[in-house]
């Protein structure tokens, strides 16, 4: 990266954006070969930013706004829990600021949310068009963890396997998912959280038992 490069995280609220900053801070402090060089600390970690001192590049966690994210020049940005953003403004502001940036990079991360009308579903729909060859974009890389069939989530283990591939490698996660599924089957009010967060299924709401297939929207 060039000197004075800027990096940002955006999220539905400032607290969540700062969680990204905290995760980066912990990773740096846990990586002595990265954090220090010849006994000198290479990063200055403050409450509102992290600076890489050799190149004076800075990472800043941004609080969500509907009008104050323009004018940034992000070499890279990370947008977290995009499904909870009320509009796509934050993402579009970051992308617009990268117009003159070389080697630009953006990460868009989220679980599903109860409604299909959110910025994350727009990003997922575009990624699927690229994967299906409908749209051409060789700069896009997407990991989409969704079950092929959503109807039999109560009995079909493949729903959880496809939505949580890490459970194939870590038995403790798989055991926890099975407990959460059993609870969601028994307690109707728990289904929305289980299905959206752990199965990546858009669930319309308690009492409806209606699933939305995004291909039909």
Placement of each model-derived feature along the sequence:
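Structural motif
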Residues: 8-10, 76-78, 107
